[in-house]
Curated annotation (Swiss-Prot):
GO biological process, one term: L-histidine biosynthetic process
Entry keyword set: Amino-acid biosynthesis, ATP-binding, Cytoplasm, Histidine biosynthesis, Hydrolase, Multifunctional enzyme, Nucleotide-binding
UniProt keyword annotation of Nucleotide-binding present: yes
Protein name listed in UniProt: Histidine biosynthesis bifunctional protein HisIE
Record organism: Halalkalibacterium halodurans (strain ATCC BAA-125 / DSM 18197 / FERM 7344 / JCM 9153 / C-125)
CDD domains: NTP-PPase_HisIE_like
Length: 211
């Protein structure tokens, strides 16, 4: 596409919805003008236009929390963008994973959607932990130790699942499977592989074949 395919408003701006490419959660909404859009495409990192300061700003230039662009999509009218990114830290200036952490109804926000219930909740929570790295959190500990530690835990939990199943201990089995699923989700996040891509493989395998 060409920048001329986009429709900017009377102030020369277009809204950009920024989405975590892995968890698919919306992390912020900002505005771009023609120049910031072109710099985003050129550099592969997000650039926006500040309406209050009336100047371009490179996300993460000061904090280091840059956003690597994976894809940019535009709607049918060409007057709104969705920017899929890999986060290099929190998206919000408050230090939160997402700017959308308050609920009108007072609900606890993990950033999860209704795609597949608790799996989406865990995926979003793990993404939040990786971005914010809160001290004392077990998930923070795993990310700090790195892939070898995460793989070790996946192996340990898989072994526990086998033992529980071998012993025909249904109560223990469900707990061990839950632990294994959690550590697999941490591994997927570390590997930058969205759960959606795993689900797509399952869907493809079980899709009825055309005659």
């Amino acid at each position: 596409m060409n920048v001329d395919d986009l429709t900017f408003d009377d102030k020369g701006l277009i809204p950009a919805v920024v989405q975590d490419a892995q968890s698919k959660e919306v992390v912020t909404v900002a505005y771009m003008n023609r120049e910031s859009f072109e710099k985003t495409v050129e550099t592969g990192e997000t650039w926006f236009y500040s309406r209050s300061r009336q100047e371009l700003w490179h996300k993460g230039a000061t904090s280091g929390h840059t956003q690597k662009v994976v894809d940019i999509r535009y709607d049918c009218d060409g007057d709104a963008l969705v920017v899929l990114v890999e986060l290099k830290g929190p998206a919000c200036h408050t230090g939160k994973y997402s700017c959308f952490f308050e609920s009108v109804f007072g609900k606890k926000i993990y950033g999860a959607s209704d795609r597949f219930g608790i799996i989406a909740t865990l995926e979003a929570l793990i993404a939040e932990r990786e971005a914010e790295m809160p001290e004392g959190a077990y998930t923070t500990y795993l990310f700090e130790k790195g892939v070898d530690k995460i793989l070790k835990k996946v192996g340990e939990e898989a072994t526990e699942v086998v033992i529980a199943a071998k012993n025909r201990d249904a109560e223990e089995l469900k707990w061990e499977v839950a632990d294994l699923l959690y550590h697999l989700l941490v591994l997927l996040r570390e590997q930058k592989l969205p759960v959606d891509e795993v689900l797509a493989v399952l869907e493809e395998r079980h899709r009825p074949k055309e005659e």
